[in-house]
Amino acid sequence: MCFQFSILYTCYLAHFGVFPRKYLVMAGIEAKFQQNPPLGTHKLFLGAHICLRILTVTATLTAAWMMITSKQTVEVYGIQVEAKYSYSSAFKFFSYANAIACGCSVLTLFPAFSLFYRGSTPMKFFFLFLHDLCMMSLVLAGCAAATAIGYVGRYGNNHAGWMAICDQFDEYCNRIRLSLMFSYLAFVFILMLTIMSANKSREIRV
C-alpha cells in the first residue's frame, strides 16, 4: 500500500512539473524491486526451509525409535529385573510426541515442495507457521517430561526416597539420553522453521 501511494503521489507531482519525469520511472522500478525480491534469494530460502523439515523428520524419527527400543534386563540379587520405556508414562508421551511430530513433518514436506516449484504466498506460510508452532510445543512438552524422569532415574531423589537406577541399567539410560538429545535437536529445527514461517507470514495484507 505504501509503495502504491508513493507511485501515485509521484505521478501527481510529475504531472504538475514538480518532479522531473525521470524520477517517476526510477520510483516505479524501485517499488517493483522491493515488492519482488530476487528469485535466487527466495529459492534459497525455500531450499533451507525444506532441508530443515527433512532434518526434523530425521531427528524426531530417531528420537522416537531409540526411546521405543530402549530396554535392558539385569540380574539384581539373583532376580531378573527389566527396564522398558513403557513402564513410564512420561517416556510413552515422549515417544508419541516425537512420532506425531515426525508424521506431521512428513506431510508438510508436500506443501513445502509445492511452494518451491509452484510459488509461495504469505497465507500458505501462515498455515505452516501454525503447524510448526503446534509441533514445537508438542516436542518441547515431551522433552520436558522425559528429562524430568530421566534426571530422577540417573541421580535419584533422596527426599522422596527414589533411588537412581542408571548404575544398574547403564545401557538403558544411555539410549534414553541419546533419544533426548535428538529430540532437543528436533526442537531447535522446528523453532527455526517457526521463525522462518512467521517472518514470511508477516507479509499478509489485511
UniProtKB/Swiss-Prot annotation:
Intracellular or extracellular location(s): Cell membrane
Protein family (similarity comment): Belongs to the Casparian strip membrane proteins (CASP) family.
NCBIfam families: A_tha_TIGR01569
Keyword 4Fe-4S set for record: no
One GO cellular component term: plasma membrane
Keywords assigned by UniProt, alphabetized: Cell membrane, Membrane, Transmembrane, Transmembrane helix
Secretion signal, residue range per the UniProt entry: none
Cytoplasmic topological segments: 1-43, 114-124, 199-206
Domain of life: Eukaryota
Parts of the chain on the Extracellular side: 65-92, 146-177
Keyword Cell inner membrane: no
Transmembrane segments: 44-64, 93-113, 125-145, 178-198
Protein name: CASP-like protein 1F1
Bilayer topology annotation: Multi-pass membrane protein
Subunit structure, as described in the record: Homodimer and heterodimers.
